[in-house]
Amino acid sequence: MTLPSVIGNAKNKQRSAALKKAYTTLYQAIMISTQENGDITEWELPPYHASGMLDWSNEYIGKYFKIISACEDNKTRCTNSLDRICNAENPSKCSSIGMHTALYVLNDGSHIYIFSGGNPVNGKSKVLHILIDTNGTHKPNLYGKDVFTFILSLLNNDKPLQSWPSASENSRNILLNTCQNDSSQCSGLLQYDNWEFKKDYPW
């Protein structure tokens, strides 16, 4: 095995461990919250894309994290955080981290972003988008590399936290093709592969 291969394998193991740890932290927080706050389908989100996401997140999820800081709209209060995250397949294609997004800076340096998503009904959504940035402000800050997308559905009490796309509802071939075409949709493939960055992982 060549030295670059050894280095690459070591980096992938580090990435795998960081993602698995962050996912476990998030999943455990949600499970504890369901024990204390009841059925997740009864949780009430704030209005779609409105202020109050940090207060909501603190009540239902954030208080179970070990954090350095947390903030909502003015992210510079708690970190020199990113305003946007770009795609691995096209670094010029970026997504803004919008207003009304709760940001948690965990004590291991990882970041968790929480914001409403899906199709709102009567001004409210039952879906949250969650981004995990496994190494915070450190580079590369690219989807598929160190930033991964998850969905929290308040309509599904059995499997509320889902990778995107879902690892349990798609074949590996579909997950791989999806990840190859859009680096913001790679968490499903990684969860399917037990959070390992396998040889055919595109990013």
Report residues per predicted region.
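Alpha-helix exit/C-cap motif
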Residues: 27-46
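Intrinsically disordered, low-complexity regions enriched in Pro/Ser/Thr/Gly and acidic residues
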Residues: 49-203
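Amphipathic alpha-helical segments typified by the pilin-like N-terminal helix
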Residues: 1-30
